[in-house]
Amino acid sequence: CTSPTAKSTQTLMVSIEPLRYFAEEIAGNRFQVTTMVPQNSNPETYEPTAQQMMALSESRLFFMVGEIGFERTWAKRLQQNAPQTTFVNTSNGIKLIAHGHGISDPHTWMSCRNADIMARNMLQALTQCSPKDSSYFAKNFQRLQQTIAQTHQNLTATLQGKHLSFLIYHPSLSYFAHEYGLQQLTIEEEGREPSALQLQQLIEIAHQRKPRVLFMQKEFANRNIRVMAESTHTKVVEINPLSYQWPQEMRHIAQALK
């Protein structure tokens, strides 16, 4: 982890807001953390600005999820632009869930077990980058671990024995569903709007599974959500997997399923 410039030795960048939460919890006051993809932007198609490219080149670390669309599209250009910045795939060591056609679900942070792995990867990178602060980072990491463990306990208690299914437009809760034995019924088909036939088939499945909730993200709002909600008598609940407030968002999702 080299120092690009003298004035920027204590800055790092993350790709999305949930990673900023983890990074700030561990890095504390030793690093200033900035996020590349702003709130209410789509990380699948986001294009970094020239100012962000400059900020990245002056950062010591760049924490990525590793599977998000814009990360895959821009990875080579970002690394060429910031040769002295250490790029860290925080999902390293996580068993990915496939969505078909060789594409993995990128929402790895929407699982407490995965969040713990991602935080460990951050701790390792920060310790290598600034060895003199290793004990400081380790203490902060332990506190974050406790928060993650408490969140997991809370979610387990909330969802225990429910065996629920839920509808969702964009399949952002695959890891969440897997962790708590839930079934995710997805409206979107591999990034595309479903056909009338696909929509009807999903409605029939929903009538069998009897989900009570339909999760939606603001950036994916469209008429198919209303059609599905009316046809299946489900309650529409807005979620934000890209929220900085990771523990609160995880609990919000679980409470909606209670």
Segments and roles (model prediction):
Residues 1-258:
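Extracytoplasmic metal-acquisition and chelation regions
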